[in-house]
Amino acid sequence: MAGCVLADTLIGATPLGAAQDGAELHEASFYEQLAGGKIRCKLCPRGCVVGDKQRGYCRVRENRGGRYYSLVYGRPCALHTDPIEKKPFFHVYPGSKAFSIATVGCNIACKFCQNWDISQASPDDIQPPYQSPATIAQRAVESGARTLAYTYTEPTIFFEYMADCARAGKARGIESVVVSNGFISAEAQQALFPLVKAIKIDFKAFTSSFYRDICDGFIEPVQASLRRMAKSGVWFEIVVLIIPTLNDSSDEIKRMAAWIVKDLSPDVPLHFSRYHPMFKMKNIPPTPPDTLRRARQIALAEGCRFVYIGNVPGEEAQNTVCPHCQAMLIRRYNYRILENNIVKSACKACGKTIPGVWE
């Protein structure tokens, strides 16, 4: 696996053990100390080896004297209350709200990222005020949200903050959900599972070349991550952003869907989302809706039971239909629930259990 791009600490960086407004820096998890004052990060598959006064690829974790610190603990740069369907989760608490947070930074670099202004930023670029996990959890309660969502950037890189927010939320009756690229180490992922109710994975494509050339990442660790989720019992859904000419071939979609059915489960909800020109790929036009419909039909034919189309207002394939009796289960319009016929986790018409987190 390729090595890391490390960033030298800027002159005048925050002194060891203190942040600029007096809040303490938080020591990172998942690292080991090496000779010569270096450390090896074990949070994600990059395994960055970081020298003193350097940062890992994500730009938000720094070696200071042989100890590794998170520079974004307690520093959310984005906070918003969203419908949970916007994440999107279609089989998790339909119609509920999610209090969404993010810090700067990411451990990959997608050329089409819609949140590039924060995902590709560093703590030196954006310095929001400190907010403790207890504060975040209380804000979630006051917002009327049922869940805390770690989203917009990559939650893996603010793991310690996410974990503490999840614990604080749980103590106040708020569950946690994660929107992730799945690029996380096995050790960190196993620590995450008990803290969260559901995970949504942005599965970028089904080719190594796409991950390498478009995202500066690797597909194999993401596949391994998805397999671990399937074995863990944690609910998860998959979103694939279909980009014209790059990951929209019928063959690739067929192979991806077949792999999901075989290696994960036919019950994993699969969302095909429409691409809109963004960041470094503004030259590629939006995805034709018919391309998404073709992808959906291929996935259904391969055995996926719940296949959705996203970013197309009014699309019929936003709805959830019972795979047993074909009754309408959940009728949606954009992010609103118009009809919900799931009763005690089962289809109201035929009584068969519908996979998801409903209650």
For each feature predicted by the language model, list its residue ranges.
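Auxiliary Fe-S-binding modules of radical SAM enzymes
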Residues: A2-V49, L246, S250-E359
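N-terminal [4Fe-4S]-dependent radical SAM core
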Residues: D21-R40, R46-A102, W116-Q120, M328-R331
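Short, cysteine/histidine-rich loop/knuckle motifs that typically chelate Zn2+
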Residues: L43, Y57-V60, G105-I108, F112, ...
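Extended interfacial segments that mediate partner engagement and assembly in macromolecular machines
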Residues: Y68-T156, M162-A163
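Short secondary-structure boundary/capping segments
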Residues: F90-H91, Q190, E339
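Hydrophobic packing within well-folded, soluble alpha/beta domains
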Residues: C110-C113, V178, I238, C350
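Conserved AdoMet/S-adenosylmethionine-binding subsite of the radical SAM
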Residues: Y130-D290
